[in-house]
Amino acid sequence: MSKDDVIEMQGTVLEALPNAMFEVELESGHKILAHISGKLRMNFIRILPGDKVTVELSPYDLTRGRITWRAK
């Protein structure tokens, strides 16, 4: 799957779950499970409930995603 195939959406973190997973509510109102991308993990970016984030979704599974950016 190439970078062009991913769907980027904005959302808000609702809850921090075990194993670096987060429940995120997208702007469209859908709730998904998302994990942190490797670069956020390497740079120790903290993500807390209430943070605005950018999430990448695969077109194959729209219920799971990867958090790629945390808004300031």
Swiss-Prot record:
Q: Subcellular localization, per the record?
A: Cytoplasm
* One cellular component term from this protein's GO annotations in UniProt: cytosol
Q: Does the keyword RNA-binding apply?
A: yes
**One Pfam family per UniProt:** eIF-1a
Per the record, the major location class is cytoplasm
Q: Is Nucleus one of the keywords?
A: no
InterPro entries in UniProt: NA-bd_OB-fold (IPR012340), RNA-binding_domain_S1_IF1 (IPR006196), S1_domain (IPR003029), TIF_IF1 (IPR004368)
Question: Which positions fall inside the S1-like domain?
Answer: 1-72
Example of a GO MF term: rRNA binding
CDD domains, per the entry:
S1_IF1
Q: What does this protein do?
A: One of the essential components for the initiation of protein synthesis. Stabilizes the binding of IF-2 and IF-3 on the 30S subunit to which N-formylmethionyl-tRNA(fMet) subsequently binds. Helps modulate mRNA selection, yielding the 30S pre-initiation complex (PIC). Upon addition of the 50S ribosomal subunit IF-1, IF-2 and IF-3 are released leaving the mature 70S translation initiation complex.
- Family per record: Belongs to the IF-1 family.
Quaternary assembly: Component of the 30S ribosomal translation pre-initiation complex which assembles on the 30S ribosome in the order IF-2 and IF-3, IF-1 and N-formylmethionyl-tRNA(fMet); mRNA recruitment can occur at any time during PIC assembly.
Protein name, per record: Translation initiation factor IF-1
Q: Which organism is it from?
A: Clostridium kluyveri (strain ATCC 8527 / DSM 555 / NBRC 12016 / NCIMB 10680 / K1)
